Structure formats: C-alpha cells, structure tokens
Amino acid sequence: EMSASLVGSEMCIRDSLTMHDFYMIDAKVEEVARALGLSELGLDKDVTELSGGQRTKVLLGKLLLEKPDILLLDEPTNYLDKEHIEWLKRYLQDYENAFILISHDIPFLNSVINVIYHMDNQELNRYTGDYDNFQKVYAVKKAQLEAAYNKQQQEIAELKDFVARNKARVATRNMAMSRQKKLDNMDIIELAAEKPKPEFNFKTARTPGRYIFQTHDLVIGYDEPLSSPLNLEMERGQKIVLTGANGIGKSTLLKSILGLIKPLSGDVEQGDYLEIGYFEQETPAGIETTCLEEIWQEFPGYTQYEVRSALAKCGLTTKHIESKVKVLSGGEQAKVRLCKLINRESNILVLDEPTNHLDVDAKDELKRALMAYKGSILMVCHEPEFYDGLATDVWDCGKWTTRI
C-alpha cells in the first residue's frame, strides 16, 4: 500500500515537472533569453552590471519560465525593443493559462487580449473584446448615460419648479407633495468627473548656432568601451531619434553628449547658445519632496498658485500635487519631470525614453507638443508609432555598439 502511494506521488511529481518543462529547461532558458535579447549579454553575467531595461528583461524571462497559473504583467513592453515585443506578443497569444495585463501599448493590447476591465468613477466594469472594441462600446455607453443625465436634470428642474409654485396653495398642495415625494425617491444619475488631460507646450529659447553638437572620434562607456569611435553631428532644427537594443549605450551616448559623463576617448563639441532641456528615463532615487516642493525648488520665483497650475496642466490632480514624488506611479513621476521641461525655455530637448509609463492621452499630447516644438530634439525611443512623423532622422545605435 505504501509502495503504491509512493508510486502515485512520484507520478504526480513527474507530471508536475513535465508540465513545467523541467526536462527541457536548459533549452527553454536559451529560447527565452534569445527572444528577449539576453543571450548576447552572456547568461553568466552579474545582474548588478545590467542596465534597468536589461534587468526588467531578466525578471520578465524568469516569470515566463515559471509558467504560473496566472501571469500578472505590469507594463511588460516598457524597455522592450520592437522584435522583443513581437516575440512576447506571440508568447501571450499561445499562452495556455490566464494572464492579467496593464499596458499603454495599444497595438500590443489589441493583439493579445479578449477582455478589458475598466476602472471608471470608482467602479470596475467588464468589456468583452480588444481595446478598440472597448473604446466603441464605452463611447456609446457614455453617450447614453449623458443623455439620461440631461433628461433627468430637465425632469428634476420641472418637478422643483412645480413644487415651488404649488406647495403653498391648498388646491394644489397634494400634487406638490406628490411631486416632492417623487423627487426624494429618485435615483440620481451622476456623471464621473472628467479626468484632467495634460497640456504640454514647450517654451522656445533664442536660436542656437548652426551645429547643436559634433563628436570627434568619441568612444563612450564606463570601464569598457560601448562604441566604436563616433564622428556625429547634429544641426539646428533636426529631430533625431536613437534606436537599438537595451544596454548598447543609447543613454550613455546622451549623457556623454551632455557632458554628464566623461568619454573614454575623443570629445564632444557643443554648439553656441544652447539652452538644453534634459528628460531622464527614470526619477532619481532618494527624492523625499512633494510634487509641489519639487517644482518650487526648480522655479522659486513661482507663486504656489503658479506651481499648482503648472502641475495641473500636466494632468496631475490635487492629490498627486500634494503627494511625495516617490509614492507616485511611473507615469505621474514622468509628468512631474515633464513639468520642469515645459516651464523652462530651451532650444534643444534631450529625451531618454519619454514615453515609458505615459498613458495614451499623455503620449498623444507629448507627440503633438514635440511636433509643434520649434527647437531641436535628440531622443531615445523604442516606439516607432510615437516617432513616426516626428523624427527628421533615425540613428540605429546598433551599428556603432561594441555590445553586439
């Protein structure tokens, strides 16, 4: 009897191991690492040596290899390049178990989901279909609710008017009381307050010289070179996008051009009369200030009203404005950093993955603002749908890197 029990337990363990690909785990690790662009880094590399985007890929790969019953994915396409997003798309389309996904990448959403849960006015509502279908159904539902609200408001006004005119007269008092009772028992329709939409309008400084920067045999990196010698130049009016896989040195190139880190060799010659606006990929760690204090420190001449107004224009609510920066979501923190940029004159914007974490409305408004911007732009971005129609030039950093 004990032997049969042990055999049964062994079979359960074997089935579980088989289900989780235990007997082909090495091949699975290689497959996921290759698909997420981790193989070229070396799988024996210390995680502490990786960039933020590379670490995110490692965590995502680890999670996918675990094959849980339910996958919880919070903005999984942030830091992923186009080919890696395509692979993740196919993976989720074939995924046998359930997954719950938060994402602002609409093409990605549409390709992998069949149910939307929408948080609206403190209610969670379920919609069947993809995001495009949800938008259509939600628009119809919203229009119907607004029509019902307007009809009810008209009825309420008429009832109140009748009660006011007839409650004092003996002949009509009972009718007035009946109308009042109807008013008291009415289920009032409430419309959700409109979510504040951001407005980004960049201030342009004086016109700079012809060249924004020129590099002369520039080799970027820290301990080891990340690039071959670079001879690049950017002219006034160009809007250049840097593309390429994570960890090949795109952010390092921006910081080298700005003079924030020293190159390993060569030099950068900045142009004349530059007024630079720099957007970092992430909020620096250790910030203890509120949003209000953060902007006030940057613009001490502003009144409190002006600081609040500046933050509100970026789509932040009173609650956000009075909260510490460190407790905000990635998208809200990005809006605080954008607030600093749009309130200072510039003639060159240097943007490191500005769309990471931003919601659809903020992303659309940012693209509009950048297209309207009269200055020059140097931007790292992994979303072609964002920079299409905006960029005058696209530079593939994979052609220069020593990491591939």
Question: Model segments located where?
Answer:
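Single conserved hydrophobic/aromatic residue that forms the stacking wall/gate
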Residues: 1-8
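Post-kinase regulatory C-tail/linker adjacent to protein kinase catalytic domains
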Residues: 200-202
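ABC ATP-binding cassette signature C-motif
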Residues: 9-10, 14-147, 196, 205-404
